[in-house]
Design a protein with these regions (language model features):
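Exposed beta-strand-loop-beta-strand "reactive/processing" segments of non-cytosolic proteins
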Residues: 7-14, 31-36, 63-129, 174-214
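Core alpha-helical transmembrane segments of integral membrane proteins
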Residues: 237-411, 415, 423-426, 436
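Transmembrane helix-loop-helix hairpins at the membrane interface
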Residues: 379, 392-548
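Conserved acetyl-CoA-binding loop-helix of GNAT-fold acetyltransferases
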Residues: 616, 622-635, 662
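Conserved active-site alpha-helix within GNAT-family acetyltransferase domains
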Residues: 627, 651-669
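Conserved GNAT acetyl-CoA-binding A-motif
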Residues: 637-649
Length: 709
């Protein structure tokens, strides 16, 4: 009896890898070529660092005579999303980008804030990405006393401020609003608004608004007024899109967790392999949250106790990080469990074998290139749907608080890593895998389509027009990633997903004129190639020193007398001379070339087969050789006349029990032994301590060794 097996199920075809590489490079080039056309806000250039923005904003207030000593400071980078969406839908993405670059609309801005806890009075300054002054706000209590000047005098103060501070030219601005209000403290506040006669974009208006508090400027704003009809339509669309998004997201989260928990309950896998990825996701998430701590001050309400505000924030961070770790852990263990039923003797996350680090980097390279294909697809999708169908989506790079964090690249890391790992485990592995299991391996196209649809429409929360545009776009991506997963492995789809998220987030950093942001952008790019390093190291080591060739095929065959010397050299506590002479015993050897790297043995007692030992050398563990040895000897014992095959496992051999359970062996006979009729507390504790101190069985003592799959 001789059985031959390959040492790794994944054998990449060179021409396929070359083709993927060429498509990936072409994809990146297409993405860059169509970036300006397809992606809104591609013309934004953030030229200020955090420190520079703080200095300029503080100088603006100091020039107005305000003293900021004793105030807490917060800085954020934000946008007027309503105005941006209206202009993009009205003008089209390409025209919007061109006019945004030349007319410098007040869409994106730095927001600098000075406040004191539990005090209403505070200051805000708004700056353009280039540092130009966009406005300010001095928030005062309503009962603060102040001057009571006429509206005419107040307008003169307002116009003087606009002319000196904001380059306002009265001949191109038309006043559209003027109102006055007496505050409880007796102060009279006057508000004025002007619209530009040179601005044309649908029914939108470019405005200056200013409020005079008593005889001082209390508020100055430069903004685009969006028509109320658009605001109402937009809110209605967002309600429908949000409902679809929430339903799809709920199905994904609950469905994937239920599948994972059921698979874990049926399989009881070893969970240690999921710890490191879960810690990685939690670590990156924690780093991103800590990196965002300076932003939290921007959302502080001065009616809340400052210490309580920070306690609540820290608790929120702890729960968010813990949840991401637990979710990743459960999904990963569930994926390993489900693979027992759908892909036996395969690791669909990453191929196992002697070349596992080379396979890891090969999958990472493949995912990197396929991420380039995704980038090109999205750019082309919105370019052509906008021109042919009138569709629109701000599928834009992340111009947001990423610029206001100390280490901007952590924002991209978190957006890339957490989403890619959790979503690919939930959708591609557990969703697709469960449907394959449910359909008995049939209807593969349906098993790929259904998760892709749910995943796509779980992104309808993104702003698009029509609201299903994002769903259509990502359904194609979901089908693509599902096919890639079935063709290769989950790591390929994770890296592809990771690459796309990282690039669309990090490209804003690379396009900035500020050196620090560009360096952060290159850190993001460098992170994309990190998964290639293990394979490069392996290749360098092989090139620098002679290593024995990788064994491509392993053989399972019956014991021969010439094997006795090698068997005696294995770290197994038994007498092979005696065992090999037992007429009712079967011994099978796992051979890698001339070397015996594993063995399994069992015997026949009447019509009952017993497996009483199995061993695989450490180098070959976690590659399913233990499973193959177990299957082959069971078949061999039944061929010899066994009507049933059993394995004896002691109560403390938990890993052996888990290993057998994973191979769908179940408990058939319970053997109970009585220790004492009654034990005192002291005797019970003594027995417990002795059990804890008891040495674990070795690799061979009437038990299955651990860690063999």
């Amino acid at each position: 009896m001789i059985r031959s097996y390959t040492s790794s199920y994944q054998k990449p075809t060179l021409w396929v890898e070359i083709l993927i590489t060429l498509f990936g490079i072409a994809g990146v080039l297409l993405f860059l070529a169509y970036y300006e056309t397809a992606f809104p806000d591609a013309s934004v250039d953030v030229t200020l660092s955090r420190g520079q923005a703080e200095q300029i904003a503080a100088r603006q207030l100091q020039d107005l005579g305000y003293i900021l000593e004793g105030y807490e400071f917060a800085l954020s980078f934000s946008s007027d999303s309503q105005a941006a969406y209206y202009l993009q839908r009205t003008l089209g993405v390409e025209d919007y980008n061109k006019r945004l670059a030349t007319e410098h609309w007040p869409i994106y801005y730095w927001s600098a804030r000075w406040f004191k806890p539990l005090q209403k009075e505070e200051f805000r300054v708004y700056l353009a990405p280039s540092g130009d002054f966009l406005g300010m706000h001095h928030i005062l209590p309503e009962d603060r006393p102040g001057a009571q000047i006429s509206q005419t005098d107040a307008q003169a103060i307002a116009e003087s401020f606009l002319s000196q501070r904001m380059g306002w030219q009265p001949d191109i601005w038309e006043r559209v609003e003027a109102s006055s209000q007496t505050q409880p403290g007796g102060r009279v506040d006057h508000t004025f608004a002007w619209k530009s006669n040179n601005f044309s974009a649908g029914e939108g208006e470019l405005r200056h608004s200013i409020t005079i508090q008593g005889d001082q400027v209390g508020y100055a704003g430069h903004y685009i007024k969006v028509p109320e009809a658009f605001t109402r339509q937009y809110a209605s669309e967002r309600n429908v899109a949000g409902f679809i998004n929430n339903i799809a997201y709920l199905v994904i989260v609950l469905g994937s967790m239920m599948v994972a928990l059921v698979a874990i309950g049926l399989s009881r896998p070893e969970a240690s392999r999921a710890v490191l990825p879960a810690l990685l996701v939690a670590g990156v998430s924690l780093a991103a949250y800590l990196n965002s701590i300076p932003l939290y001050k921007s959302s502080y309400s001065t009616t809340e106790a400052y210490s309580l505000f920070w306690v609540n924030r820290m608790i929120g961070i702890a729960f968010a990080v813990l949840f991401s770790a637990i979710q990743t852990f459960i999904l990963l263990v569930g994926a390993q469990s489900l693979s027992r039923f759908v892909w036996p003797l395969q690791d669909r996350i990453l191929a196992r074998g002697q070349d596992r680090w080379l396979d890891f980097s090969r999958s990472a390279w493949r995912g990197l290139m396929l991420g380039g294909v995704q980038l090109a697809y999205v750019a082309l999708f919105y370019t052509f749907t906008a021109n042919l169908l009138g569709w629109w989506s701000p599928a834009t790079s992340e111009y947001s608080d990423i610029f206001a964090t100390p280490l901007p690249f952590f924002y991209a890391f978190n957006a890339g890593l957490s989403a890619s790992i959790i979503e690919e485990l939930s959708i591609r592995f557990l969703g697709l895998g469960f449907l394959l299991w449910l359909f008995g391996g049939k209807h593969r196209w349906l098993a790929v389509l259904i998760p892709a649809l749910f995943w796509a429409f779980a992104h309808t929360g993104y702003v698009t027009s029509p609201i299903y545009a994002r769903g259509v776009e990502l359904t194609v991506v979901g089908l693509f990633l599902g096919y890639i997963f079935l063709k290769f492995d989950l790591l390929t789809t994770i890296v592809s997903h990771f690459t796309y998220n990282m690039v669309v987030t990090g490209i804003a950093l690379l396009r900035s004129s500020e050196e620090y942001y560009r360096i952060s952008g290159w850190v993001v790019i460098f992170a994309l190639v990190l998964p290639l390093l293990p394979g490069i190291v392996v290749l360098l080591r092989r090139g620098l020193r002679t290593e024995p060739p990788i064994v491509e095929h392993l053989v399972i065959s019956l014991f021969e007398d010439s094997d006795l010397r090698q068997l005696c050299g294995l770290p197994i506590k038994t007498d092979w001379h005696i065992l090999s002479r037992q007429g009712n015993r079967t011994i099978l050897c796992l051979r890698a070339g001339q070397e015996i790297v594993g063995v399994v043995t069992g015997y026949l007692d009447m019509t009952m087969g017993h497996i009483d030992g199995i061993y695989v050398a450490p180098r070959w563990r976690r590659q399913y050789w233990g499973t193959r040895l177990l299957d082959v000897i069971e078949e061999e014992l039944k061929t010899c006349g066994a009507s049933e095959v059993r394995v004896l496992v002691r109560p403390n051999e938990h890993r052996a029990r888990s290993f057998l359970h994973n191979q769908f062996w179940s408990t058939g006979v319970h053997v109970l032994t009585r220790v004492e009729k009654k034990q005192s507390f002291k005797a019970s504790m003594k027995n417990l301590l002795s059990e804890l101190k008891k040495e674990k069985p070795g690799d061979y003592e009437l038990e299955l060794p651990r860690n063999l799959e």
